[in-house]
Every structure is written in C-alpha cells, then in structure tokens.
Amino acid sequence: MSAGGAGGEAKGGFPPQTIMAIGAIGGLAGIYLGNFMPAQFSFFGGLGAICAMVWGADAVRRVASYGLGTGVPSIGMISLGMGIVAALFGLSVGGIAGPIVSFIAAAIIGAVIGVLANKVIGMGIPIMEQAMVEIAGAGTLVIIGLSVVIAGTFDYAEVVEYVVANGYIALIFIIGGMGILHPFNANLGPDEKQDRTLSVAVEKAAIALIITGFASSLHEGLMAAGLNIAVGVIIWAWAFMKYYGYVKRDSYAVVGTGLLPSAEELE
C-alpha cells in the first residue's frame, strides 16, 4: 500500500536546481549521443534516461512529501503518460530538434495539468505546478532515451516501427514509471533521505536499461544489446550496493531473521 510524505517540504540533500540540471542536460546529452553514435553505443540513450529518471524521482519526492497518499504511484504513471504524448509529438514535427521540441511540449502539458490539479481540483500543494512541469519533462526524456536504446535513433519513423508498433512502448511506460514513482514509495517516512531515495532511482533506471537492452537485440544485433545489458548490470550493481549501504547507515539495526518457522514449530 502507498502512503504520502510527512505533509511538508522535503528536506536535505542536493538542491532541486542541481538535480534538474543533471536530469535535463544529462538526459538530452545522452539522447543525442545515442542517436548520432553507432548502434553499439545506443546505451548512451539509457544513460540519459537514468539522469532523467533520477530527476523525476526527486520531483516526486518533493511533491509527495506534502502528502499525496496513494497518489504517489499515480503521479509516476501520469509522468509517462504526459511523456508519451509529448515525445511522439515532438519527434514527429521536430526533426533533429525533436527531443527539445518534445521537452518543451512536455513542460507546457505539465504546467496545464499542474494548474488544473491545484486550482480546479484544489489539491493545495504549493509546488504542484512546478513539480508537474518537471515530472512531465523527466518522463518525456525517459521515453525518448529508452526508445533510443531499442531503436538506436530518435528518428520518428524508426521509433514508431521499432518501439511503438511492436508494443515496446508499453514496456517503456511501465519500467520508466516504476523508476520515477517507486524510489520515494520505497523510502517514505519520517527518516526518508534524498541519497537513499535517489539510489533506488538509479537502480531501477539501470534495470530499465537492461530490459531495453534485451529488446534492442532484435533490431541492433547482439553486440549492441550485449553492451546495453553490460552497462546496465554494472550501474545496477553499483547503485544496489550504494542503496544497501544507505539502508545500513539509516537503520537502527540490521539483523538476520532466519527462515520462517514451520507450521509444526508454531504449534
């Protein structure tokens, strides 16, 4: 079951502007590198998606700290919903500037939804408008970045053929949404820390790179797919160990419980 945050502004860690810069600049840089470099280096699109996913998870952390309840998963899903619309629109009309056009379109969509959430629905969260702009932008970059991993390019026709028409877009929607919504959901509470939360975002984003790496084998070949998977596994292992270290740091005690007792032992 999901729960909201503590009912106020998220505290501690890197300032939002720093995470935003990492997500937006890193996301776009990875997408363009993955597009222009040979297919073997399409994992750069995945690295861009990781940057964007961390940004999205931090935005969810900040807005959900005001208390969204079961809206924590919902806001992650809406980020990818906005992202798909903005990504396909921008790539279809923007040409080489497609990712940038998509990013701008996402910001506009996010702003509209943020205003509706606060002014019409009356959620009353001070940063809702800004957070929805950030979450929409991050979701869009995640969609495009993971599409580059699979298709090797952000060319609209190839993305439609190799990502949308065969249904991989649904896969990206789920794994991208989980990477944005799950980190705060897994760490929420009065002792939530930004570094612990965002380490989960990196870990989930690495899993997304691994999964899309497998999907890329059908179009890009085994060498490119192998590199995508290898990079994802390395990042996942690093992020998981960082997360485990943060858990031990923040826990009162880490103990082994052993195996669950059998029915006979409980009698």
From Swiss-Prot:
Is Transmembrane found in the keyword set?
yes
Name a Pfam family for this protein.
Answer: MtrC
- Reading the lineage from the top rank, the first entry is Archaea
* Subcellular location, record wording: Cell membrane
Gene Ontology annotations of biological process type: methanogenesis, from carbon dioxide; methylation; one-carbon metabolic process
**Which UniProt keywords are listed?**
Cell membrane, Membrane, Methanogenesis, Methyltransferase, One-carbon metabolism, Transferase, Translocase, Transmembrane, Transmembrane helix
According to its UniProt record, which reaction does this protein catalyse? 5-methyl-5,6,7,8-tetrahydromethanopterin + coenzyme M + 2 Na(+)(in) = 5,6,7,8-tetrahydromethanopterin + methyl-coenzyme M + 2 Na(+)(out)
Associated pathway: One-carbon metabolism; methanogenesis from CO(2); methyl-coenzyme M from 5,10-methylene-5,6,7,8-tetrahydromethanopterin: step 2/2
Q: Name one GO molecular function term.
A: tetrahydromethanopterin S-methyltransferase activity
Q: What is its EC number?
A: 7.2.1.4
This molecule's function is given as: Part of a complex that catalyzes the formation of methyl-coenzyme M and tetrahydromethanopterin from coenzyme M and methyl-tetrahydromethanopterin. This is an energy-conserving, sodium-ion translocating step.
Q: Which family does it belong to?
A: Belongs to the MtrC family.
Q: What is this protein called?
A: Tetrahydromethanopterin S-methyltransferase subunit C
Species name: Methanosarcina acetivorans (strain ATCC 35395 / DSM 2834 / JCM 12185 / C2A)
Q: Gene of origin?
A: mtrC
